[in-house]
UniProtKB/Swiss-Prot annotation:
Residues 500-525, 938-970, 1111-1153 are annotated as: Disordered. GO terms for biological process: iron-sulfur cluster assembly. This is Iron-sulfur cluster assembly protein SufD. Residues 510-523, 1111-1136 have a biased composition (Low complexity). Keywords: 4Fe-4S, Apicoplast, Iron, Iron-sulfur, Metal-binding, Plastid. Proteolytically cleaved. One of its GO terms (molecular function) is 4 iron, 4 sulfur cluster binding.
Length: 1462
C-alpha cells in the first residue's frame, strides 16, 4: 500500500476516535481543564465501582470528592504501609516508565506523547518534561509552553504503537488513578509537583501543553519525500485541514484571568462554582493575527463575523484599523507586481471620541481588484457552461451564486440599455461572472457583495434605524418573546391582590437588606437586583458583609420556594421571570449610566430632547418626532415592536431569491445606478414649518355651491327685499351708544373683552384684533371689508346679516355653534389669492347665515328694541335661510371657486408620525363623541321597540345587559387616525396587529397547494390541477417585491393607522396622509444660506465621504515627459501673459503686478515639480524599476441617500364609507435615497373606500411601493394613483376579494428625462360575481421608460365574473419607450365579460391639424390634446392642487416640443 493512502487512513482513524474534534473548541483558550470539565457535566450521574473498567471514551482524570481525599491522607500518615516499590509498580501498569519520569496525560495526549517518532525516544521525552525557570511564581503556572517534537521517520511504528496503547487502556483500573490525582486540577500538575518535591523545590511551575496536531501530521507525512511529492502532498492535505490551519494553528492568546490554587478546606459548592467558570480569552482571532506580522490574515472564513458590524460599536481608532486590515481584499504590492489594475475605496469613518465625546473623522482605504469589461450579448436563452468555470460566459453554475450571501444575489440582477456591454466591477455583482481573473476572485467571493456594495450590506443587516440604539438589541431577551402568550394567564394570577398581600412582608425585608448593601458597594442599582442563583451572586461580591447578606437572601428565597411547592408551574414561572427581569433591568440602568442619562447614542438626537432618569421626555427643543417606545424599554408596546421586526427578518430569509434573467426581464430597468448608490440613514433634522406643506395639502371644491345653482332663480327674487331691509337697519344706529366707538375705518385692538355687545350696524373697513372675547355679541348688520382675527372666542354670536369681502381666521373656537346648513366647525374655509379685491372697487355680497336659533338675551332696555327688529327680520328671511345661501348674480362664478380643506391631515416624517405637523387631535375627538351619541340614540330606539314586546319580568334582566353593553361601547372609539403605538382600544389593536404581519406572496402561502416552485418544470404541471394557484408559481410571482415588503416590516419605526367603525358614513370627508422623505442635503442648502446666523450650532457637522479611485499601470518615461511638457507650457503661458499685459497697459504699476504673479507661479510650480521628482526617485528605488500606477477619480459620494420605510394600515368595518388620500413627497427636488413603502387596506361587508395615491418625490429617489387590498363581501374599492416624481418608481397592486365585491383602478404617469416608472397590477378572482375595471395612461417624453403589466386570474369557482383592463401610452418624442403587457388567465366558462388591451402610439396628427387650421399654434394644440388625454383620469381625483401640478407638467412637455411642418 502506498504511503499516501496510509497517511489519509491514519488521519481518518484519529478523527473517528472520541473527543478528537471537541479539543478544537478549547484550543482557543488553551486550557486543557475545559476538556475534562465538559466530560464531568455529562457523566455526573455515573458512579464508579472498583470492578468497573471504563473504555477509552469514558476515561476521565478529574474528580472532586474531597472527603475521600482527607481519609486517604489520614490513613497513609497513620499506617505508612504503602512502599515506594508498590507505587512504582502501579505506575508502570498504568502508564509506563521513562527514566524515572512518569508520563500521565489525557487520552489524546497520552497517545501522541508516547509515539516513537525517532530512535531517540528517551531524549524527546526528557526535552518535553524538563522545564526551565523553576523559580517562577505559582500563578504563572498556566503559561503556555509549546511542545518541541522531532519529526517522525517510520509510519509503520506509529500504527503498531497506537494499537498497543489502546489495548493498555482497556486493562487499566481507574480508581487507582483517582486516588492520586484528587488534589490537582490536571494530571501534569501532579507529576510536576512530585518532581519538585523530590528536588526540594517549593516553587511550582505547572506546564500546560498545547498539542499542535496539524503540524504533527504535516511533518510526519511530508518528511523523507522528494520535492515533487512534497508539493503534491501539501496541496492534497491542505484541502482537509485548511480551516483549522488558518484559524487555530497559531492562535495563542494569553488569558487575563488566571485560576488560583484550590484550597482543600472549601466546600463542594465552592469547588463546583469555580469549575463552572471558564477562562475564555478576551482577545479575538483577528486582533491576534494582526499583532503577528509574519503572515497576513487573508482568509475568507471570518467575513461572516465581520458582516455583523451593526451589533458592535467602533468608537476607537484601533478597532477601525482592525476592521480595515481584515477587509483588505488584495495586497497592493502583489497586485502591482502582477501589473494588474485595481480600485481604491477611500472612506472617512465617523467615530465618537470617548474622552472628549466629540465626533471625529478617520480616513482609511482598502483595495479591490478591477474587473475587465468586454462585450457580450445578454439574453434569456440558455448558454453552455464549461466545467472549469474559467470562460467569461459563466451564468448558471457559477460558484458565486452559492457563495454570495446577499438577498439581491447575482441571479436576479441584470442590466439593460445602451451601456449594458460596458460595466465596471463596483456596479453590479453579476460582473464576477464576466471576469478573466476568475481564479483570483474565488478568494473574495464569499464577501463580494458586502465590500463591493455597502448598500447591500446595509440592507441585509437592516441598519435602517438611526434612532434605535445598538446596545438595546443586545440587551433584549428572546425568552420574553417566546413565552409571552404562554405565561400571560399565570402572570395575572401571580399579580392578583391575594398573592401580593402575602408577599408584602417579604418585600419589606428584601428592601432593608438592599439598603444595607448600597452602603458597602459602589453599585447604586443593587436595590432592584434579587439574586436567585448562586452563579449570579458569586460574581460580584464587594465585602465580607455583602456575602453574609447574600446568604441571608438565599435562605429567604428557599423558604418562599418551599411554600409554593404545591404549584410547580407557578414556581417555574416566578423563578424564570424574576431572574430575567432583574438582570434585564440592571443592564438597562448600567446602559443609562454609560451615556450619562442620554438615551440616544447619536449626538444630533441627544441635543433635541431632555429626559428624566426613567427615560421620559421632559421638554422638546426641536419639532422632530421620536416615539416614546425608543426611549422606554419598559413600555408594553416595545415588546410588540420587536416582535414585528423579528418576524420581518425571518420572512426575509424564507422568501426565495428570484431568477436573475426573469427578474431583469420583469423589472425592465437598468439597476446599475441603484447598486452604485451608498445608502445610509442621513435624514434631516431641521425644523419643518406648516407653511411648507400648504401647497401639498388638499384643496377640495365645496359641493354645496354646485347644489345651489338650481336655487339661483328663487334667490334673485328675494334679493331686492333683503337690500331694503339692510337700509332700514342702518338707520337704527342711535339705539346703542356704545356702537359709535366701533364705527370707524380702521379699528386695531389687541384685546377686546365685552360681555354684552349689542349693535344694529357695525361698519368697519379694517378690523384687526388678536383676541376678541365676548359672551354675547348681538348685531343685526356687521359690514367689514377686511376682518382679521387670530383668536375669536364667543359663547353666543348672533347676527342676521354679516357682509364682508375677506374674512381670514386662523383659529375660531366656538362653544355653541348650530348651523342650519349642516356646516361643522371642523371644516375651515379659505379663499385663494385670486379673490382679493381693492378698496376702490368694493362689492357687498349679502350672505344670510342663521347661526343659532336659541339666543341669550340680557335684561337691558336696549335689548327690547333689538328683539322686535330681530323677530321681524327673522320672519322675512326664514324660508331663504333654511334652503341655501343668498348669492348675487354677479358673483356666482366667484362662489364656485371657493374651496375647503381636508377633514384631517396626518403627517408622517421619515416613517414616524409627527403630531406637530399634523392637525389638532381635538377634531377627531369631537367627531368621535358625535358618532358615539348617534350610536347611543339608535341603540335606545331599538331597545325600546324590543322592550315593548317583552314581558315586565324580562325587562329587568334586559336593562342590565343593555346598560353593560352601552358602557363598553362608550369606551370604544368609532374612528382613529394616528400612530399604531398610540392605540389604546384593545379591539383596534387586535385587528390592526393582524394586518401588520401581512407580506404579499409570503403570507398567502397558507392556502392549499400554494407553495412556491423554485426549480424545474413544475410550473407547467400546476396548470393541470384546479386546487393549485399558479399565481404563486415561481414564474409568475414577484419575490423581489416581497423581499422589499419584508424589509419594510423588519425595519419598521412606526405605522400610520386609519380605523373606522360600523355604520358610519364619511363619504363627504377626506383623510389626508402625507409621507415626507427628508435628507441632509436639505440641511446643507439651508446652511449655505444661513452661515452667518448659525455659526454656533454644532448639529450640522462634516459628514462622511465615500470616493472610488482607479489605479492603472503606466510607464515612467511617459509620465516624466508629460510632467516636463506641462511645466514648459506653464512657463510659456506666463511669458505670453506678460507680453500681452505690456502691450495693453503702459502703466508701470500694472507691469510690476503681472511680473510678480508670474514669478510666484514659477516658484510654486518648480517647488511642486521638485517634490514630485524626489518622490518618483524614492519610489523607483523601492519598487526596483517597477511600473508606476496612475490614479483616476471615478466617483465621489457627497450626496446623502437615506432609506425610509413608511407603512399604512387602513381597516374599515361593515356599512361604512371613507375617502383616503395618500401622498409621498420630498420638500427638496434634488433629494435622493430609497423609499420602501407598504400599505395594507382591509374592507368588511358592504363597505366603500376611495383610495388615491400621489408620488412626488425627488429627482434622484428610488421608490418601491406595495399596495395589498382585501376586499369584503359586496364591498367597493376604488384606487387612483398619479406618478410624477422619482428617478425610478415601481408600484405593485394586488387585490383579493370575496363574493360580489367590486374594484376599480385608474392610474396616470408622466415621465421625463431618464425616469423609469412601472406599475404592476394583479386582480385575483376566487369567488363568484366579482367585478374589476382598470384603466392606466402614460405620457412619456425625452429618454424615459414606462412599464405596465396587469394580470387577471379567474378561478373555477369565480362564476359570472367581469374583468376589463386597458392601458394607453403615448410617446412624445424619439428616444422614449414603453412596455405594456396585459394578461388574462381564465378557467371557468360561465363568465359575463373579460377584456384586455394595450396601445402605444404618438399623438394623433389629424386633430392637431384641425386645431391649427383654426388659428391655434402647434404647441398649444399638442397641449390641448394632452390635457384631454389626462382629464379622463383626473376626473376621479378631488384634489385641485394635484390637478394643477399635473397640468403644469403637461405644459413643460408642450414647450419642449420643436415645431415641424406638415
Amino acid at each position: 500500500m502506498p504511503n499516501i493512502f496510509l497517511s489519509n487512513y491514519i488521519f481518518i482513524f484519529i478523527l473517528l476516535t472520541n473527543k478528537f474534534l471537541k479539543t478544537f473548541d478549547y484550543v482557543e483558550s488553551k486550557h486543557w481543564n475545559n476538556i475534562c470539565l465538559k466530560d464531568l457535566y455529562d457523566k455526573n450521574d455515573i458512579k464508579l465501582n472498583k470492578t468497573n473498567k471504563l473504555k477509552l471514551k469514558y476515561k476521565n482524570f478529574m474528580f472532586s470528592d474531597l472527603k475521600k481525599q482527607k481519609k486517604r491522607k489520614e490513613t497513609e500518615t497513620a499506617t505508612g504501609t504503602i512502599t515506594q516499590k508498590q507505587k512504582h509498580t502501579k505506575k508502570k501498569k498504568l502508564h509506563g516508565q521513562t527514566n524515572g519520569y512518569f508520563i500521565k496525560r489525557n487520552k489524546i495526549q497520552h497517545i501522541f506523547a508516547n509515539i516513537p517518532y525517532n530512535n531517540n525516544f528517551k531524549k524527546i521525552n526528557q526535552d518535553i518534561y524538563t522545564f526551565k525557570n523553576v523559580n517562577y511564581h505559582p500563578k504563572n503556572a498556566n503559561k503556555k509552553v509549546y511542545l518541541k517534537i522531532n519529526n517522525a521517520t517510520h509510519l509503520e511504528t506509529i500504527k503498531t504503537y497506537i494499537t498497543k496503547c489502546i489495548k493498555n487502556y482497556r486493562h487499566q483500573n481507574e480508581e487507582k488513578t483517582q486516588k492520586k490525582i484528587r488534589n490537582y486540577n490536571n494530571i501534569i500538575q501532579y507529576y510536576v509537583s512530585r518532581k519538585n518535591n523530590n528536588n526540594n523545590n517549593n516553587n511550582r511551575f505547572i506546564h500546560t501543553y498545547n498539542m499542535l496536531f496539524i503540524n504533527i501530521f504535516y511533518n510526519i507525512i511530508s518528511k523523507n519525500r522528494n520535492e515533487k511529492k512534497k508539493k503534491n502532498r501539501k496541496t492534497d492535505f491542505q484541502k482537509y485541514l485548511r480551516k483549522y490551519e488558518e484559524l487555530y494553528q497559531k492562535f495563542t492568546p494569553e488569558n487575563d484571568a488566571e485560576n488560583n490554587d484550590i484550597n482543600n478546606d472549601k466546600n463542594n459548592s465552592d469547588l463546583i462554582s469555580q469549575i463552572n467558570k471558564k477562562n475564555i480569552s478576551n482577545i479575538i482571532i483577528n486582533e491576534w493575527c494582526l499583532r503577528n506580522n509574519n503572515e497576513k490574515y487573508n482568509s475568507t472564513l471570518m467575513y461572516d463575523y465581520i458582516s455583523n458590524m451593526h451589533n458592535t460599536e467602533y468608537q476607537d481608532i484601533t478597532c477601525v484599523n482592525n476592521f480595515i486590515k481584515n477587509n483588505e481584499m488584495i495586497e497592493k504590492e502583489t497586485w502591482e507586481h502582477k501589473q494588474k489594475p485595481y480600485l481604491t475605496y477611500k472612506y472617512e469613518f465617523k467615530y465618537r471620541d470617548p474622552i472628549n465625546r466629540k465626533n471625529k473623522l478617520y480616513q482609511y482605504e482598502y483595495y479591490i481588484p478591477k474587473l475587465i469589461t468586454y462585450e457580450e450579448d445578454i439574453s434569456t436563452e440558455p448558454k453552455f457552461v464549461p466545467s472549469n468555470f474559467k470562460s467569461p460566459k459563466c451564468y448558471n453554475n457559477s460558484p458565486v451564486n452559492a457563495l454570495t450571501t446577499s438577498g439581491f444575489s447575482s441571479r436576479n440582477i441584470d442590466t439593460f440599455g445602451k451601456e449594458r456591454n460596458k460595466i465596471y466591477s463596483f456596479n453590479t455583482p453579476t460582473d464576477v461572472k464576466r471576469n478573466i481573473f476568475f481564479d483570483d476572485l474565488i478568494l473574495i467571493s464569499s464577501s463580494y457583495n458586502q465590500h463591493f456594495f455597502p448598500n447591500l450590506n446595509f440592507l441585509l443587516n437592516l441598519h435602517t434605524l438611526q434612532i434605535l440604539i445598538r446596545d438595546k438589541t443586545a440587551i433584549e431577551t428572546d425568552y420574553m418573546i417566546d413565552k409571552f402568550d404562554q405565561l400571560k394567564e399565570k402572570l395575572i394570577q401571580i399579580n392578583s391582590p391575594h398573592v401580593i398581600d402575602n408577599n408584602q412582608n417579604d418585600d419589606i425585608d428584601n428592601n432593608n437588606n438592599n439598603n444595607n448593601n448600597n452602603n458597602n458597594c459602589d453599585n447604586p442599582y443593587n436595590k432592584r437586583i434579587i439574586p436567585i442563583n448562586n452563579k449570579s451572586t458569586n460574581n460580584d461580591a464587594c465585602t465580607i458583609d455583602n456575602i453574609s447578606n447574600i446568604q441571608h437572601r438565599k435562605n429567604q428565597t428557599n423558604d418562599q420556594n418551599n411554600k409554593s411547592k404545591d404549584d410547580e408551574i407557578n414556581e417555574e414561572i416566578s423563578s424564570n421571570l424574576t431572574y430575567k427581569k432583574t438582570l434585564f433591568d440592571d443592564k438597562i440602568q448600567l446602559f443609562k449610566n454609560k451615556y450619562d442619562k442620554n438615551i440616544l447614542d447619536d449626538k444630533d438626537f441627544v441635543q433635541l430632547w431632555k429626559y428624566n432618569e426613567k427615560g421620559e421626555i421632559v421638554e422638546t427643543i426641536n419639532k422632530i418626532p421620536i416615539p416614546k417606545i425608543y426611549l422606554n424599554i419598559d413600555d408594553p408596546k416595545y415588546l410588540s415592536w420587536k416582535i414585528l421586526q423579528n418576524s420581518g427578518k425571518t420572512a426575509f430569509k424564507e422568501i426565495p431569491t428570484p431568477n436573475r434573467k426573469l427578474e431583469a426581464w420583469r423589472q425592465q430597468v437598468n439597476l446599475k445606478t441603484f447598486y452604485k448608490q451608498n445608502f445610509d440613514s442621513s435624514i434631516s433634522l431641521r425644523n419643518i414649518s406648516k407653511e411648507e406643506l400648504v401647497d401639498y395639502k388638499m384643496k377640495i371644491v365645496d359641493n354645496t355651491f354646485e347644489k345651489n345653482e338650481k336655487v339661483q332663480n328663487d334667490i334673485s327674487d328675494h334679493f331686492d327685499n333683503i337690500k331694503m331691509d339692510n337700509q332700514q337697519n342702518e338707520e337704527k344706529v342711535e339705539l346703542n351708544e356704545n356702537i359709535n366707538y366701533y364705527n370707524s375705518d380702521n379699528i386695531n385692538g389687541d384685546n377686546i373683552n365685552g360681555d354684552n355687545i349689542n349693535g344694529d350696524n357695525i361698519n368697519g373697513d379694517n378690523i384687526n384684533g388678536d383676541n376678541i372675547n365676548g359672551d354675547n355679541i348681538n348685531g343685526d348688520n356687521i359690514n367689514g371689508d377686511n376682518i382679521n382675527g387670530d383668536n375669536i372666542n364667543g359663547d353666543n354670536i348672533n347676527g342676521d346679516n354679516i357682509n364682508d369681502d375677506n374674512i381670514n381666521d386662523d383659529n375660531i373656537n366656538d362653544v355653541n355653534n348650530n348651523h342650519n346648513n349642516n356646516h361643522n366647525s371642523d371644516n375651515h374655509y379659505y379663499y385663494g389669492d385670486t379673490h382679493k379685491i381693492n378698496n376702490q372697487n368694493k362689492k357687498n355680497v349679502n350672505e344670510t347665515i342663521n347661526i343659532s336659533e336659541n339666543t341669550n338675551m340680557d335684561d337691558n332696555n336696549n335689548n327690547e328694541i333689538y328683539s322686535q327688529n330681530y323677530k321681524e327680520q327673522r320672519i322675512k328671511n326664514q324660508d331663504i335661510s333654511n334652503n341655501a345661501y343668498n348669492f348675487n348674480k354677479e358673483h356666482i362664478d366667484k362662489c364656485k371657486r371657493k374651496y375647503k380643506k381636508a377633514f384631517y391631515t396626518l403627517v408622517v416624517r421619515d416613517g414616524i408620525v409627527d403630531e406637530y405637523l399634523s392637525d389638532d387631535i381635538n377634531i377627531l375627538k369631537n367627531l368621535d363623541n358625535k358618532l358615539k351619541k348617534k350610536s347611543e340614540i339608535n341603540q335606545n330606539k331599538e331597545n325600546e321597540n324590543e322592550n315593548e314586546n317583552n314581558s315586565q319580568s324580562d325587562n329587568n334582566t334586559t336593562k342590565q345587559h343593555i346598560q353593560d353593553e352601552q358602557g363598553t361601547e362608550q369606551k370604544k372609539s368609532k374612528i382613529f387616525v394616528g400612530s399604531f403605538f398610540n392605540v389604546k382600544d384593545v379591539e383596534i389593536e387586535y385587528l390592526i396587529n393582524k394586518e401588520l404581519y401581512f407580506i404579499p406572496e409570503h403570507s398567502n402561502w397558507y392556502k392549499t397547494n400554494t407553495q412556491p416552485f423554485i426549480r424545474g418544470q413544475i410550473g407547467k404541471q400546476s396548470r393541470k390541477f384546479d386546487n393549485d394557484y399558479p399565481i404563486y408559481d415561481y414564474r409568475k410571482s414577484d419575490f423581489g417585491m416581497a423581499k422589499f415588503s419584508s424589509l419594510n416590516l423588519a425595519s419598521i419605526k412606526d405605522c400610520a393607522v386609519v380605523y373606522l367603525d360600523e355604520n358610519i358614513d364619511l363619504s363627504d370627508k377626506f383623510i389626508h396622509v402625507i409621507f415626507i422623505a427628508t435628507s441632509k442635503n436639505e440641511d446643507i442648502d439651508n446652511n449655505n444660506n444661513n452661515n452667518d446666523n448659525n455659526n454656533d450650532n454644532d448639529i450640522y457637522e462634516k459628514q462622511s465621504k465615500y470616493n472610488v479611485y482607479e489605479n492603472i499601470p503606466s510607464n515612467n518615461k511617459q509620465t516624466n515627459s508629460n510632467n516636463n511638457s506641462e511645466y514648459n507650457n506653464e512657463q510659456n503661458n506666463c511669458s505670453n501673459k506678460q507680453i500681452t499685459n505690456d502691450e495693453q497697459n503702459d502703466n508701470e504699476y500694472e507691469k510690476e503686478e503681472s511680473i510678480q504673479k508670474c514669478h510666484m507661479e514659477k516658484v510654486i510650480s518648480s517647488h511642486d515639480d521638485t517634490i514630485q521628482n524626489c518622490d518618483i526617485e524614492k519610489n523607483e528605488c523601492k519598487e526596483n524599476k517597477k511600473s508606476k500606477y496612475t490614479q483616476i477619480k471615478l466617483t465621489e459620494y457627497h450626496t446623502h441617500n437615506p432609506i425610509t420605510n413608511p407603512r399604512l394600515v387602513v381597516y374599515v368595518k361593515g356599512n361604512s364609507k371613507i375617502n383616503i388620500y395618500e401622498s409621498h413627497i420630498s420638500l427638496n427636488k434634488s433629494n435622493s435615497g430609497l423609499v420602501n413603502g407598504f400599505s395594507r387596506i382591509c374592507l368588511e361587508e358592504k363597505s366603500n373606500v376611495k383610495h388615491t395615491l400621489s408620488q412626488e418625490l425627488g429627482n434622484n429617489v428610488w421608490h418601491f411601493h406595495n399596495v395589498s387590498v382585501k376586499n369584503g363581501l359586496n364591498a367597493n374599492y376604488k384606487f387612483v394613483d398619479v406618478l410624477l416624481g422619482s428617478l425610478s418608481s415601481r408600484i405593485n397592486l394586488q387585490i383579493e376579494g370575496e363574493k360580489g365585491c367590486k374594484q376599480e383602478s385608474y392610474g396616470l404617469s408622466l415621465l421625463e428625462d431618464k425616469q423609469n416608472i412601472s406599475q404592476y397590477e394583479m386582480f385575483h378572482h376566487e369567488h363568484p360575481s366579482m367585478e374589476t375595471n382598470q384603466l392606466f395612461k402614460c405620457l412619456v417624453s425625452d429618454k424615459a421608460h414606462a412599464v405596465w403589466r396587469s394580470r387577471g386570474r379567474i378561478e373555477r369557482n369565480a362564476i359570472k365574473a367581469k374583468l376589463n383592463t386597458l392601458c394607453k401610452s403615448i410617446l412624445l418624442n424619439f428616444g422614449a419607450s414603453a412596455v405594456c403587457i396585459p394578461t388574462l388567465e381564465i378557467i371557468p366558462s360561465d363568465i359575463e365579460c373579460a377584456n384586455h388591451g394595450a396601445t402605444i402610439s404618438d399623438l394623433e396628427k389629424e386633430p392637431i391639424f384641425s386645431l391649427m387650421t383654426r388659428g391655434i399654434s402647434e404647441r398649444n394644440a399638442r397641449e390641448i390634446m394632452m390635457n384631454s388625454f389626462v382629464k379622463e383620469i383626473l376626473d376621479h381625483i378631488s384634489d385641485e392642487n394635484l390637478k394643477n401640478r399635473v397640468y403644469q407638467k403637461v405644459l413643460k412637455f408642450s414647450q419642449k416640443y420643436k415645431s415641424s411642418t406638415y
